[in-house]
Every structure is written in structure tokens, then in C-alpha cells.
Amino acid sequence: MRRVYTDFHIHSCLSPCGDDTMTPALAAGLLKLAGYDVAALTDHNAVGNCPAFFRACESYGLTPLAGMELTTAEDVHVVCLLPTLERAMDFGRAVDAHRVRIRNRPKFFGNQLYMDAEDNVTGEEPDLLPNATDLGLEDAFALACEFGAVCYPAHVDREANGILAILGDLPEKPVFSHAEFREPDKREEYLIRYPRLAPLTPLFGSDAHRPDAIVDPCFTLEIADSADVAAAVMERLRSKP
């Protein structure tokens, strides 16, 4: 067994709330410099910058995961981590069919830039990405699982788009076994307020949208000592808490 430093919640300049300088390549380089072993790119309702992130991670020696921060019909943010880049691209196309199409207004919401691994802009997403899909919470998890994803609610310790703030509590029988915290020190406080969190395995995600928001590693995950680190991480996340 071995322990790896992870951050499973990173945005790029494809997310309109992300800084235009947060290119997939820059994110990969900064994550490596910060000391991470594994990181996931999780833009809002999109996976279009994952290929560039993967190529950049390969050059930097960082293990990448392809992911998405999916917005459910209830406006809850859910992190979806996919087993391979190919499955992630397929999942992205599936989610596209459930997006509510509203034209992006870059001057108001921000740019939504597709990039290559050399920091070149290859296109721009015309429709606003972060708004809610038509997928309810359980339907979103069911769809993601069809593509082999590991899913869990994002930033449960945040008011905006956090499942606890939106729904008031966790479902009595949740379809997920993890919960993401932005600030690990808040977990004990939240366990007192929301006892249903207790059985869930806590994960850390910085939710970084800007280069200066990539923080020093503070969370490790114990995985099998395997040459395929990404597969070992996914296997660990699928295991029961």
C-alpha cells in the first residue's frame, strides 16, 4: 500500500467562474509543483479540457483523473470522477443532452475557453455551463454510474450549491458513500449538525478556480501499490468506507 496526495476538484478556464489564466497545462504544472500525486479536472458540466489536462500531466509526471462537477436539477454540485479519459468524453456527451441551453454572456459570466496542452485557445463554449441540468440527484448518479464514475456531493461545507444548504440534510439513504469538504477542519462541526454525514468517507477538494487557489496538499488517500495509479485510486474510491 502507498499514500498519495490528491485533489479531486480543480477547474480550468472552461468554467466561466475560472480565471482565464487557469489553463489545463498551468493547473497541471502548479499541482505538481505543490506536491500532488493525483489530481482531477472537474469543470462545470463539461469535460472538454480533460484531454489537454491529461497531456500536460503526462509531461509533468502527475497522475490525472478526468472528471466533472455536475449540477443537478436541484442545483446541487456533484463531483463525478471517470475511470478513463475515453469514458469521460462519452459521459460529457451524455450530460450535454441534459443541459439547459442558455447563451453565455462572457462579459457577465466569464469566458469558457477550450485549450490544448500548449496553452492555445482551440474554441469557446457558447452556452453557459454551470446552470442546472434536468437531472435530479438520483438520476445524475445513475447516469454517471453507467459510465463507471465515482460520484459524491461537492463542498458539503459550503452554502452555494452544497447539498446540505440546498436540501437541508442528506437523503436518508444516500446513493453515494463519500462527501467532499473544502475545509477538512470543518468536518467535526458538520458531523454534529448533520449526523448522516458520519458513515460517509470524507474527501478533500480545493475547488480551485484560479492559479493562486491551488493550495498545499493536506489530504492523502491510501491505495494499492500499483503501476496504474489512476486505476488504484478509482478502486479505492469504489471500496466500501
Where are the language model's segments positioned?
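Alpha-helix-centered segments that form part of catalytic cores
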Residues: 111-146
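Charged catalytic cores and adjacent phosphate/nucleic-acid-binding surfaces used
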Residues: 1-8, 12-30, 34-36, 47-90, ...
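A short beta-strand/loop micro-motif in the catalytic core of glycosyltransferases
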Residues: 39-40
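Active-site gating loops and adjacent loop-to-helix segments of metal-dependent hydrolytic enzymes
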Residues: 82-125, 169
